[in-house]
Amino acid sequence: MNNFSIISGYKPAGDQPKAIDEIITGLNSKKRSQMLLGITGSGKTFTMANIIERTNRPTLIMAHNKTLAAQIYLEMKSIFPKNAVEYFVSYYDYYQPESYIVRTDTFIEKDSSINEQIDLMRHSATRSLLERRDVIVISSVSCIYGLGAPDLYYQMTVHLEPGQNYPRDKLLNDLINLQYKRNDIGFERGCFRVKGDNMDIFPSHYSDKAWRLSFFGDELEYIHEFDPLTGEKLTQLDKAMIFGNSHFVMPRERINHAISSIEVELQKRLEFLKSQDKLIEAKRLNQRTLYDLEMLTETGSCKGIENYSRFFTGRNAGQPPPTLFEYLPEDALLFIDESHVSVPQIRAMYNSDRARKEVLVEHGFRLPSALDNRPLKFEEWEKFRPQTVFVSATPGQFELEETGGTVVELIIRPTGLLDPECIIKPATNQVEDLISEIQTTINTGLRILVTTLTKKMAEDLTSYLQDLQYKTYYLHSNIHTLERIEILRNLRQGTIDILVGINLLREGIDIPECGLVAILDADKEGFLRSETSLIQTIGRAARNSRGKVILYADKMTKSIDKAVSETLRRRQIQQEYNKKHGIIPKTINRAIHALESLEEIHDNKLDKKQANALLNNPAKLKAHMDKLKKEMFKAASNLEFEQAAKLRNQLKALEEAALKLS
């Protein structure tokens, strides 16, 4: 069994050793819930990594969005290069759910665009959980949504070993049951091809490796791994396991049983609708369901098959659907990052999904069983979650209640950095005073973040500062993903000095060069000026030893009082620690590499404008990547390996950029 092994030039420092020991003690004493209160820059990810290494338990880390999940994934992958670090988020680049608008009698078909790279990573995650224990899965809230049952998924795997008797026709049939497609021309993930005594399989969990099976009659002589692009043999395998090309693969007898159950439910529902004199709804439901049943009978699948998932998994009405949590071993560990956001998000998922589907069922677009194709209810998630460590700088009410108000604090930063000084100034002449503070900060070579309450004020302030010849930019939700990252990069490099926004704490702003955070109208109580929001915003200035925060307010609100008092408490603890240990605070010097993958795109002859257009249009991106794949394989078949390698690099750069920006 592989053990977790951290590969890093750093050792736990500051509050980290104490926090690691306390959390592990709690885990060993069977505490179900613990709270790790980690401030900005305290090394929460590294602390989690050390807890994982010392407990040596399979781990799921939940984040509240894809961007944060991707950041944690990249960090954990660099810390644990020898272990299985996996990424499990929604594989939709674009998703329009099936819905019906009663007021206008409008039915909207489900429309989606699947990201092949993320689909591959989801398969890799479930495979790792079934095959090994040294696994860390970083996931979004996608992990509480229905997935194929793990027992069926594992039951359908094909086990292969050299010397084994495995009739080739049976293997072909088994691969088709696993939803692999035969394609002797375009060899890609989820496909297989046959040539003479050889069969090539491109597993669903790989992007750059395939397997070649060589037969002598019905005997499997050998299996070797090869590069599907160049055909180069990589290594010989003593065994191979082929998992389904979908998490919803199932034996034919299970499909037949499901079809019978669907037919029974259809008849009951039709009788009910007719008894209510809903003849149009009954006719609509009958036509739609019979078409799906015909497709299931002939092909084993149909559009919207997930709406019948209850019958395929063998669950009863109302029972929770199988999710990623059922793939976790009993002794797994769960971290919930930014729990003050993640927990309410988990709580909200079920109700929003239920409301939409009830309308579809009521108006004859779906059978009532479609209601069981859903995310977990909060109470169900509570039951399924293993030992949990909530992680946040601003814990929510649920986490504090679960842990009895006991928190393990990460307040001392390894760099010795202090929480920023907070200054409260009158809001009456806030813009005039802000300009004076901006000039002082710019003179020291640092950057400024300004947060406003409204979009109009942000726009007006940006224009005003630009008229005064300050290098200012307004960061808002309509900015394209590529442009947003370039703006942040320009801010760090000094091309921009001032960034204005409404909710900067939500934008993932992490700028070591930030010397001033200005919060305008800080005394206007509400979501954007709550205690949690203020503490999170104040934390944006905690990456620089000269960072400070100015709150413009004409009155002291409860939120300001609590946020400033908490920041001062932490600052005093940090100052005492630094004085005791002779530590001088050092600004974090982090390399500017956010656009690395995008620069690789440009190096491969894809201009900036084209990259921006592609990354913000999933359909165009997929079409362009499909075109690149075809050109790549064509170049390889013509033995033009240099050209094929260039195309492969461009394709990989696009995939990585899309992942980072998703």
Swiss-Prot record:
InterPro entries in UniProt: Helicase/UvrB_N, Helicase_ATP-bd, Helicase_C-like, P-loop_NTPase, UVR_dom, UVR_dom_sf, UvrB, UvrB_inter
GO molecular function per UniProt: ATP binding; ATP hydrolysis activity; DNA binding; excinuclease ABC activity
Official protein name in the record: UvrABC system protein B
Localization in the cell: Cytoplasm
Keyword Cytoplasm: yes
UniProt superkingdom: Bacteria
Domain UVR per the UniProt entry, residue ranges: 622-657
Motif (Beta-hairpin): 91-114
Family per similarity comment: Belongs to the UvrB family.
Subunit structure: Forms a heterotetramer with UvrA during the search for lesions. Interacts with UvrC in an incision complex.
Entry note about domains: The beta-hairpin motif is involved in DNA binding.
Signal peptide: none
Source organism per UniProt: Rickettsia prowazekii (strain Madrid E)
Gene that produces this protein: uvrB
Gene3D superfamilies membership: P-loop containing nucleotide triphosphate hydrolases (3.40.50.300), UVR domain (4.10.860.10)
GO cellular component entries: cytoplasm; excinuclease repair complex
Boundaries of every Helicase ATP-binding domain copy: 25-414
